[in-house]
Amino acid sequence: MKIGIIAYQGSFEEHYLQLKRAFDKWSINGEITPVKIPKDLKDIDGVIIPGGESTTIGLVAKRLGILDELKEKITSGLPVMGTCAGAIMLAKEVSDAKVGKTSQPLIGTMNISIIRNYYGRQRESFETIIDLSKIGKGKANVVFIRAPAITKLWGKAQSLAELNGVTVLAEENNILATTFHPELSDTTSIHEYFLHLVKG
């Protein structure tokens, strides 16, 4: 199994370590590789789009020619997990809590609507407990950093976890989106669930 991690910015190393822990837990002989240009997508079984600044990630990905390639592969069934800014990249509808609708480059393959900076400056970073029973796990302590919120889901997209009634983890077929940072958690539950999607 070969998992790629988009490596423009964001927590590449933290995702790498969480994947290694999940591989070890499941006794998977897996490979993890950074993804920056289209040829890096060759022969991967799944891809992670980490957090960071979604507009920057989108612009760099578009300039390097990987944005359309990612969209095509994800549409064709490549398993993908987008965390925080990565979830924004996957959404079909994006707006900002302050400025409204945005025109940033998106992959746009998931039937969800996201509001950037949903929790505002007062809560730029916080930790809390969420219930992961819908993915067969227990409660988990997770980290939110300038987090967006998934405010609408349609089609086959479904909510897998909520915080105060707002979706923070969603899935649609081969696509997984989290508004928190699972790579900063003390549990590998989310990465394990992603590997479950990759294994099919």
Swiss-Prot record:
Molecular function (Gene Ontology), one example: glutaminase activity
Pathway annotation: Cofactor biosynthesis; pyridoxal 5'-phosphate biosynthesis
List of residues binding L-glutamine: G52, E53, S54, R116, I145, R146
Residues annotated as the enzyme's active site: C84, H181, E183
Subunit field text: In the presence of PdxS, forms a dodecamer of heterodimers. Only shows activity in the heterodimer.
Family indicated by similarity: Belongs to the glutaminase PdxT/SNO family.
Function description: Catalyzes the hydrolysis of glutamine to glutamate and ammonia as part of the biosynthesis of pyridoxal 5'-phosphate. The resulting ammonia molecule is channeled to the active site of PdxS.
UniProt-recorded name of the protein: Pyridoxal 5'-phosphate synthase subunit PdxT
Native source organism of the sequence: Saccharolobus islandicus (strain L.S.2.15 / Lassen #1)
